Amino acid sequence: MPEPTQKPAKEPVRAPIKEHFQLRETIVTIAADDPAHIEAAKEAIRVHRATLETYILADPYFQFTLEPYECPENAPEVVRRMVKAGNTMGIGPMSAVAGTISALAVEAMVKAGAKYAIVDNGGDIALINDRSVVVGIYAGQSPIKNLGLIFEPRDSITGVCTSAGTVGPSISFGMADAAAIFSDDVSLADAAATALGNEVGIGKEAVEVAFKVVKTVQGIKGALVIQGEYIGMWGKVPKITRAEVRHEYITKA
């Protein structure tokens, strides 16, 4: 009589390695399964940040303009991505700096073999994940707290970038406690989050009207806004769940 077959036990999913990394104003949290993948991200950040600094030394206007900017065709990759994203949204290229650095870092991790890689650059996040990931949205003093978004497993890079007029040091001309954009173009997500945040006033109607700035932009999957006691969503937004979101968890870039 044959022995009954037994299914092999599933190996437990190990917790990812997390590391905080700071290079001058760039402060990131990196998550991966392999220390080598984290090192790949750190090296990419060093290289692309140095390239960006060199470009800004040659043209300081790039850093300070809040308007669309034209760059030469032979400009560095980091510059071209930022310019394209900012111009798409009708704002300056620095609106996309954090998301662009995050994306370039995750791309380097993927080249190093990563199937699970997350870089959080001050709330501007690039990720690729072979298992579900919950990303928390921090909305400052809003009563809408402990909000998480479930990113299902995927084999390509995507992004979620957040801007706020009431939280953090970044420039915003609006009153959003959180304005988040979902896009596979992480540079675009960053610039669009800035543009969306700029549009948010106070109250329910102000939240509803703000989405007009992103509704017609190709490449944007969805958007979410929290303003005080109000929350609004447009397009395709990841499934919402409860998540423990504390201020000290936020990468302060």
Swiss-Prot record:
InterPro entries: ApbE-like_sf, MA1715-like, UPF0280. Belongs to the UPF0280 family. This is UPF0280 protein MA_1715. It comes from Methanosarcina acetivorans (strain ATCC 35395 / DSM 2834 / JCM 12185 / C2A).
